[in-house]
Amino acid sequence: MQNGPSAARKFDLEDRLLEYATAIIRLTERMPATRAGNHVANQILRSGTSPLFNHGEAESAESPSDFVHKLKICLKELRETKRGLRLVQRVPLIVSAAEVDPLLRETDELIRIFVASIRTATKRQLRETPAETYHA
């Protein structure tokens, strides 16, 4: 196990993603067992729990580009979940649409974290990639 600030940050993000996935599951369990409720719940359940699993995949990436790719999948899934949560509020598909507000705020924060992580990893990748040389 790593020590220091980067290890704490990694653990914090993993823990946040675990809490986020838990909140998504709890929300979808409270949605109505109607055709629309089931459809939206299933979609949010998939996209809202995916960042937890894909972040784990990113930690075991086979290359820097694989790492960035997996982070981008997390970002894509978070953006999809945000749209689903907004739909839950708009319809509404739960008794109190305001219950979704904390999840939307956390989704926005996680999106910002992943955008920053992707930028940092991409810059690092560009710095560490040696310039290609062509021999004639």
Which residues does each predicted region cover?
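Amphipathic alpha-helical assembly/interaction segments
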Residues: 1-136
